[in-house]
Amino acid sequence: MTDAPIGIFDSGVGGLTVARAIRDQLPNESILYVGDTTHSPYGPKPIADVRRYSLEVLDLLVEQGVKLLVIACNTASSAVLRDARERYAVPVVEVIQPAVRRAVAATRTGRVGVIGTVGTIASRAYEDAFAAAPDLRLFPRACPRFVEFVETGVTSGDEVLRVAAEYLQPLRDADVDTLVLGCTHYPFLEGAISYVMGEGVSLVSSDIETAKDVYRILVSGGFERHDSAPPTVRYEATGLDAEHFLRLAHRFIGPEVSQVDLVQTGVIDLSL
């Protein structure tokens, strides 16, 4: 069990931010990453579909023998976390609570913005997560085109800045001092988001805090990897275009992603 990989899943390349943070903090751990590019993006899809897609990918990871699951997707975290923790015998880590924890520590004024996909914002998952900090005022905002930009490799330029300004102006008007990047794709747009929000606004993402949660669970459970052999890091995608995923991975996290394998998930009937 200790030598088994950590399983990480996202709808596409956004979860690579989380995978990179886990590799930085736990360099001896093996990783198996799956991007569900067949169904990406998750954000605009009905929650029932997101739930089914997510469980199909998580089933695939468990079948491949992972020792811990990371749902590196805010939309999936909001849709399937409870199901996943009931369904699987391995620990399940999500990305919403880690971001909330960091935002609560970062804010000075108690005015916190959160941006995410339509699905994440509509789920009110962040409102629920921030409920334990009643002195904070939360300003949620859906930014649906941000995932589209990242998944097509566009992270800068006039159109990105124009769309970012349109999405973020209400948060500037609300005078937030902390902005939660409530989608793991959004750190790839951090330059544009930071430029639009201006100095004095702290941007909070879940990647580093999620990696801390993974570290804590592995150490406290006594199943961190001690093998002296180099760890393995594998990347899989459910879509038909592994080369596209590979190009984006090279651009965003570097040439260490040398291969992407295509995989197929099973089909789950959640009506049973």
From Swiss-Prot:
It catalyses: L-glutamate = D-glutamate. Its EC number is 5.1.1.3. HAMAP family: Glu_racemase (MF_00258). This is Glutamate racemase. GO terms for molecular function: glutamate racemase activity. Pfam families: Asp_Glu_race (PF01177). Belongs to the aspartate/glutamate racemases family. InterPro entries: Asp/Glu/hydantoin_racemase, Asp/Glu_race, Asp/Glu_racemase_AS_1, Asp/Glu_racemase_AS_2, Glu_race. Disulfide bonds: none annotated. Keywords: Cell shape, Cell wall biogenesis/degradation, Isomerase, Peptidoglycan synthesis. SUPFAM superfamilies: Aspartate/glutamate racemase. Transmembrane segments: none annotated. PANTHER family: GLUTAMATE RACEMASE (PTHR21198:SF2). Pathway: Cell wall biogenesis; peptidoglycan biosynthesis. It is an enzyme of class 5 (isomerase). Substrate binds at residues 10-11, 42-43, 74-75, 184-185. GO terms for biological process: cell wall organization; peptidoglycan biosynthetic process; regulation of cell shape. The active site is at 73 (proton donor/acceptor), 183 (proton donor/acceptor). Provides the (R)-glutamate required for cell wall biosynthesis.
